Amino acid sequence: MKQPLKLTTRQGERIAVVAGLRTPFAKQATAFHGVPAVDLGKLVVSELLARTSLDPKLIDQLVFGQVVQMPEAPNIAREIVLGTGMSVTTDAYSVSRACATSFQAVANVTESIMAGTVDIAIAGGADSSSVLPIGVSKKLARALVDLNKARNLQQRFNILRALRLKDLMPVPPAVAEYSTGLSMGQTAEQMAKSHQISREAQDALAHRSHTLAAQAWADGKLSGEVFTAHVPPYKSPLERDNNIRESSDLASYAKLKPVFDRVHGTVTAANATPLTDGAAAVLLMREGRAKELGLEPLGYIRSFAFSAIDVWQDMLMGPSYATPLALERAGITLADLTLIDMHEAFAAQTLANLKMFASAEFARDKLGRSQAIGEVDMDKFNVLGGSLAYGHPFAATGARMITQTLHELRRRGGGLGLNTACAAGGLGVAMVLEVE
């Protein structure tokens, strides 16, 4: 094993996560219908600041992400600073790494604190699947540019005459990978077939996720990290995630038909994450600064790693590539972990990654390692449920996972937690968290 990489400042101070918060997550076109991601981001950052009673002027930087970006607000981070009463001198920039976006935001802040250029910062992400950038066809887009350049009526007429009715139809955001034309669901189907992940196993994992998430809410474990969201038209506030099946029945999952391969497929709406709206954020600072301000850290960032793999085959296998790196950089093994939280984009993808964690063949042929990182103890795995139940606002999921894991580690008296996720484009992330 290589030497661990210590994530500390030059003075040896660790990077502390002082607080984390999120909105409830809402299924597309439900409680947050019509509320753009930037407004959800403002909500969560405003509430985070209010709960920590931290002077906004002390915050040096805000790094925020959004995957489904709106053209009118391309830098969501800066709009949040300007729209929440924070100091206008607070630096802000936006990041995007698909489903790993808020992990990237946290990693960037961590590195800035380590470098000494930032003392206190907020990282997070927000996405709305209910407010989408509906575009126009390429032919119409070109015609609109040409119309702006046209010098006379005849030129304008000639441009418009070339358009057909189909060119005027609105174009929704693409659901397929730009490089391959394949959707995430199609990749999940491929992984299910390639790694022999049965429909029964997928449905069982989804049922487990919903059951554990419902129990977490019933036990009050999430109340301190999710706030009641009041959004226009202010008729009915959302207090908790509305995708969770409160009384999940395993038998009911078998009734749904496959979505992406209707003949031989196993991926259904029930064993895949739904389109979701929501926002999440975490407050980070060097541990010495937290002590100066009288703030008790939730925990610390021990290590992180990102990975990139081929997009044509097993595109969602990122956790299996990033996790060995993160564990190595933390100087630990899989057995040292108290908790493991893997993003459940699809049950098939999750189960395939768990299989590869334990595969000596995968370790040898794909990772160039002499042994597998190990079989996951399911008593440590996604103990409060996962994205299949909570939903997945793309840019917010990482911050949700970090906050949730740190709180659960504290309830268990401390330890080490792993967060890991796949992301579009063959990307992956793993992050090790520590609670004393």
Swiss-Prot record:
CDD domains registered for this protein in UniProt: thiolase
E.C. numbers: 2.3.1.16
Gene3D superfamilies recorded: 3.40.47.10
Keyword Thylakoid attributed: no
GO cellular component term, pick one: cytosol
Described function: Catalyzes the final step of fatty acid oxidation in which acetyl-CoA is released and the CoA ester of a fatty acid two carbons shorter is formed.
PANTHER family noted in UniProt: ACETYL-COA ACETYLTRANSFERASE, CYTOSOLIC (PTHR18919:SF107), ACETYL-COA C-ACYLTRANSFERASE (PTHR18919)
Name used for this protein in its record: 3-ketoacyl-CoA thiolase
